[in-house]
């Protein structure tokens, strides 16, 4: 074969691969409208705390799925009442949903198959943002600021012996209902504050706000006075995989869908912990405006308060800053924050 023939063959091969990649991207990014309508799994609103065991065989995966008219990325598989279910992520909108696995044809893939999607860009960028590098730990690593002009409201629900501040959450702006908020939920908070959790679901059903459920670990380990390199999830014996997956499993058992975001307790992590979140295809979430910790809000800020009863001063600062115009409005869904 001549050199010219070889060159033409090589060029045809490159073009074919490029077209195949483009076709895959188009399929992946297309909205699976008909599949979403007929295959969505509707979770019942619980009347009491449901055990995590109601969700069976919960596993993290990475699968490229194709259904009736579109595609999606599966990051978890599970069973509900014997039915196989997928936790699907929209690789561009960064939203999640639960759908019947029977509606999809899926294959296990390497990350290279979804490289270039907004999902992988956000996961990788947050994992590579070290925040403040301290001796033995990282502080406020991950995504800390979003796209302006609005703000991103995030409230942490760490384990607490106090009731959630319902009055504060009821005061959130409602000029453009439902107000998008992100709540970082820990497994132990949900187990011990079901009435407050149910109140949140009722408010959401009433249209007051729409909640993005951020994973805040299951146990949220903390010992006062212990150095941060051996505290929070850096505590000896912590299994980050279980902290992540057990929280998601309990949340699904109690009627809600986990998001793609994970916030480390105390905003304290480490390089191995950041990698653990990344391997679960989660976006590590920090904050550039933890109000009670001295953060100053500005357009695009990810604002952090604790409506769990543990940090009333932060709630007062939020009310003050919102009234004075220091907190930029409108509030935006957290899914809009990553570039």
Protein language model regions, located:
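Active-site groove signature of glycoside hydrolases
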Residues: 140, 144, 148-159, 214, ...
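Terminal accessory/targeting
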Residues: 1-154, 164-166, 170-182, 188-195, ...
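Short, glycine/acidic-enriched loop or turn micro-motifs at the edges of active sites
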Residues: 159, 219, 309
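Metal-dependent polysaccharide deacetylase catalytic core of the NodB/CE4 family, i.e.
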Residues: 162, 175-275, 279-303
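Functionally engaged cysteine thiol sites
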Residues: 39, 158, 241
């Amino acid at each position: 074969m001549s050199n010219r023939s070889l060159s033409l063959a090589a060029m045809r091969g490159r073009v074919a691969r490029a077209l195949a990649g483009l076709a895959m991207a188009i399929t992946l990014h297309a909205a699976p409208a008909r599949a979403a309508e007929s295959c969505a799994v509707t979770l019942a609103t619980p009347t009491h705390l449901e055990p995590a065991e109601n969700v069976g065989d919960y596993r993290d995966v990475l699968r490229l799925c194709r259904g009736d008219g579109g595609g999606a990325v599966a990051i978890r598989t599970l069973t509900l009442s014997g039915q196989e279910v997928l936790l699907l992520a929209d690789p561009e909108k960064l939203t999640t949903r639960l759908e019947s696995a029977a509606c999809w044809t899926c294959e296990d893939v390497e990350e290279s198959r979804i490289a270039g999607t907004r999902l992988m860009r956000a996961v990788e960028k947050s994992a590579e943002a070290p925040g403040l590098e301290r001796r033995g730990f990282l502080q406020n690593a991950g995504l800390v600021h979003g796209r302006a002009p609005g703000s991103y409201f995030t409230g942490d629900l760490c384990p607490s012996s106090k009731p959630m501040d319902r009055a504060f959450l009821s005061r959130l702006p409602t000029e453009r209902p439902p107000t998008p908020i992100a709540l970082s939920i820990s497994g132990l908070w949900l187990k011990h504050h079901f009435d407050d959790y149910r109140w949140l679901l009722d408010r959401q059903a009433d249209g007051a706000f729409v909640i993005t459920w951020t994973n805040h670990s299951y146990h949220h380990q903390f010992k006062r006075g212990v150095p941060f390199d051996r505290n929070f999830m850096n505590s000896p014996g912590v299994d980050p995989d279980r902290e992540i997956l057990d929280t998601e499993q309990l949340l699904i058992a109690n009627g809600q869908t986990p998001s793609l975001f994970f916030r480390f307790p105390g905003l304290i992590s480490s390089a191995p912990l950041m990698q653990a979140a990344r391997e679960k295809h989660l976006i590590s979430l920090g904050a550039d405006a933890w109000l009670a910790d001295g953060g100053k809000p500005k357009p695009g800020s990810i604002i952090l308060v604790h409506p769990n009863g543990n940090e009333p001063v932060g709630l007062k600062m939020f009310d003050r800053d919102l009234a004075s115009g220091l907190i930029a409005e409108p509030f935006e869904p957290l899914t809009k924050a990553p570039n």
